[in-house]
Amino acid sequence: MNIIENIILNIYSIDLNAFKVKQFGFIMNYSPNKQFAFLGDEVCNEKTEKYIKDCEWIFSDAYMAGKEAEEYNPIERHHHSTVKFVAEMAERLNIKNIILSHSTDNDLEHRKQIFIEDAKKYYKGNVFAPYDLETFEIV
């Protein structure tokens, strides 16, 4: 792990216009042309999309993937995103990397593979579906 000294971070909150309860995410400028956005616990809506266009990274909930998501429809039931929803949004908004989290625990052994493969059907960038406590560098 590299330690960067003398870095200035600009972090600001964004109203996520959440449906269930008032929520705020954040955008962090971590270099002159790179941003990391945390999108909270609900589906990202059109009012929020303008803030994340061209971000280097987004961290988003993705409750389910594939056929399971199509059948259960977590967007309608709980206002949680699906892998497909996040991947299509990221592709449309020119986001370079997505981190998918806040998912079901139905198949933890294969979840990472399932989520990444599903996202790659709709998105050309990098996809991360970390296990709890897994770490990786954000560059």
Labelled PLM ranges:
Residues 1-50, 132-139:
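Core dinuclear metal-dependent hydrolase active-site scaffold
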Residues 43-133:
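Cap/insert and terminal regions of metallo-dependent hydrolase folds
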